[in-house]
Amino acid sequence: MTAFFAVGLSAQNKCTVSGYIRDAATGETLIGAGVMVMVTDAASGGKTSGISLGTNASAEAKAKSSMANSKIIGAVTNEFGYYTITIPCGNIDLTYSYVGCADVKQNIDLQRDTVINISLLQAASLKASTIVGRKDAGIQSTYMGALEIPQEMIKNMPVVLGEPDVIKTIQLMPGVQGGMEGFSGIYVRGGGADENLMMLDGTPLYNVSHLLGLLSVFTPEAVKKVTFYKGSFPARYGGRVSSIVDVRTNDGNAKGFHGSVSAGLLSEKLHFEGPIASENTTWSFSARGMHTFLFDRLIKAFGSPANYAFYDINAKVTHRFSDSDKLFAGFYTGRDYFRYSDSDKSSSRYYGPDYEPYTKYEEENTKMNLKWGNTLASVRWNHVFNSKLFANTSVSWNTYKMNMVTNTRELLKSETENYDKQYRYSYTSGIRDLGARIDFDYIPAPTHLIKFGGEFVNHLYRPEVERSRSINNIGGNKETSDKVNDASPNLYGNELSAYIEDDMTFGEHFSFNPGLHLSLFLVNGRTYFCPEPRAAVKVSFGKGWAVKTAYSRMSQYVHQLTSGNLSLPTDLWVPITKNIKPVTSDIVSLGTYYSGLKGWEFSVEGYWKQMNNVLEYKDGKMSFSSAADWEENVEMGQGQSYGVELYVQKTLGRTTGTVSYTLSKTDRIFRDGTINNGKRFPFVYDRRHNFCVSLNQKLGKRVDLSAIWTITSGNWMTVSTRSTLTLSPDGKGMSMVDYISSRNNYRLPPSHRLDFSVNIHKKKRHGERIWNFGMYNAYGAKNPNWVTLDSREVKNPDTGKTTYIPALSKKTFLLFLPSFSYTYKF
């Protein structure tokens, strides 16, 4: 009877263990690290089997009975490396684990709430870490379509010109389409390029492309962790309707000064980090800059004399006041510069009224300078109130700005006339955000992880400001004219949001995550309110099998107006207005998963997605003359996307890799008839089939090989079926009239390519040297990187009538593109 009383008392006494899990070599906190403990059902408050084993029972029988009446309780660190786990008090064995690190086991006599900070050592070889607990991504997560992108996967993938890239790695995932061949835009489950929330340490970025989309702004050396959501979205995220890319950067090495330098065909990179005075304060700095001697070849493929350059700078300082308080200050800035200059000179022989000869000299000079980029700064404060309540408070400032300046000059000199005409034009647009946010993690019981918080963002949109100056000097008479055209005045928008979600577990086989995101947007006297319910369910059947289903509603208050297949810096970001409503999406997903085979993960997911208030240009309005008239040239409609995604990943051994396949269909419809006569038409990036295989092979201690092979259906584009030469309306000339049967009426041929790279490592006295050699499009597939619509003249021999047949001109300039780079790490 005394024994039963003791068990009952223990069941009522719970203790909480909390703290940070760090990398022993660097002091960096580890995101997604696990802690677990095995407890008996009796100790955890469960029912006993009612079978008593006597003193003569064998130790093996007792062990089997103990295992049968035991269960595992686990927890996972959040995005700041903090964990908390509530378990029965008493003598326990805690196991801490992280992929690629050796497990740490710790026995403690737990009698009260306790703080335990643990450091894990990297293992000599990648091992299978058993992480039990609530993860935000992967098969173990309750969420669907949530993936963690390992840093090593990003660095090892072969890409254009040998530059590892976060966004290009995400393109390998099922359900994700790339934009133009070779470029880094992503289109997720039928959504547009502007429907992806790109976050750097919790702060959104508006333009994440360099080189017109060839690379993203995320420098791999600065990246600590990347989490990608495309199916079920945690309630703490909002603002976009298709995907979330959450990039977290390094805090800095607390153990010593370390870094790397790298040089390749495209850019040079620096990364340094270390402590300041003590391990409590750390810093991290990364910089990347471009040289253009190889990229000039790509620019010249368009037949234009141009120069291009870009840079990125990441900086971060972290200070730990105590185990309960930590302060972060982060900064990023990046710029792209595009310069174009052209000059045309000519001289002609003419005759005057009396047939006297004279020479006319003409000269025309054109220069254009275009620059754009992001700058952001943020300060975050972590505070641990107690073992069950964790908070993060942040304030941020973010700006995106684009500026274009063109200068033209026309000179003419002759015996009869003389003039000098100069014209300068500047165009500026941009966005500025000021935000404040607070997030809480609250664990009232082992079966609940409640996240809640709120955010306020003040948006300033500056769609377009034009300035021009003309100077005309004709025959010695000089005239100057200045003009300022603020085509669209400043637009202010205030966005407020609040959320709550609860990741609940019911036993070992069922988990449920309900959530609600509420958002309010105020602009020009109009208020929009969008409730966004979210829910995700996971049912585990044992032996690695699981089934998940989810529903998410998302809303978006900003649009990007683009008239081409590339995301260009001149594309405008504009907010919703009184006439343009928020974009909303509803997505339902169902999938099955298997992880019972050691080192392997398999998944099959199906989804259906409905989008409302998506924007397209009206027929005949594929571009706009100024930001003032953009609302008149676009129309709101609906879109739908549905498909099936298969994903296989091998994570252990000398050979690792992924296989992904997507079968999907995406279309749009504008029922008012202003687009495609109100009929449904395919989305530009409706690619029916998308197949990708990636492979990483260790060929020894010093050499590793990576390869990617992809094949995908072609994009859609709008082409005219015939063209007719007709008399212009003024009767003074001829004009070409195109007949277009429907929007997006032609699918480009499928594209495929093989990329590979080889890394050669060598240990040096004070670090490691890495040579990288790669080849993009290794067998020279002629996939179109640029497509234009021309016409071909055809003459009917019987009637003599001339017609013009559309003809596509396809340019391929990413062909047999080699790369190499040198990296030294210390």
Each language-model region and where it sits:
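C-terminal beta-signal and adjacent terminal beta-strands/loops
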Residues: 702, 711-734, 749-755, 759-826
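Short, acidic, small-residue-rich periplasmic hinge/interaction motif at the N-terminus
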Residues: 22, 34-40, 62-64, 93-101, ...
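Outer membrane beta-barrel strand-and-loop segments of large Gram-negative receptors
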Residues: 424, 429, 433-437, 486-487, ...
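Surface-exposed extracellular loop regions of Gram-negative outer-membrane beta-barrel proteins
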Residues: 343-344, 348, 401, 543-588, ...
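Face-selective signature of the C-terminal outer-membrane beta-barrel domain
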Residues: 318-336, 368-524, 540-542, 603-604, ...
